Amino acid sequence: QFTTLGQNITALEVDGTFDDCQALVKSAFMDEELNRHMKLTSANSINVARFLPQSFYYFNAYAQLDKIGKADQLVVSVPSGNFGNITAGLFAHRMGLPIKRFVAANNRNDVFLEYLHTGVYTPRPSVPTIANAMDVGDPSNFARILDLYGKNGNPHAEISQLISGYRFTDEEIGATMKQVYNETGYVLDPHGADRK
């Protein structure tokens, strides 16, 4: 993934899942001894500075649709792994962007879909899929979503009114990729195909 590295960057290979890597990063952030000697930051959506700028393209998409008269009743489908992208969209919504509904597209790692159905959040180990950037069993941004919508004491009701969820199998994702290619000649990545 890295073609050149600065002197302050070291790439490490971890024998584990995204959740394992995320746990290591969070542990490093909490390590007082390590933090006395190094200044640490994360390049993924644990860091709000990573996903907050993503809220701008929701505004941009709305503006483009508004120009052609199609902005009313806007529904946005978002591939959902660690929930940084959809959290950025929810921030945009809180800032006043009139998005009617969000769809959290999940692969087999569907802890958020389960939460929408039951009101109970149950993290679990992730399983590998062809949409591997979404292979997250405990999305760190779920806590931010709860914080955004938990002020009335019933975050599940408020979240469920704004966000729907769907789960797609590897077979469905592959079929969508094939269909889009056959119809348009465009090679769709598995994460985009997860939002059909």
Regions found by a protein language model. Name each.
Residues Q1-K196:
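PLP-dependent amino-acid enzyme catalytic core
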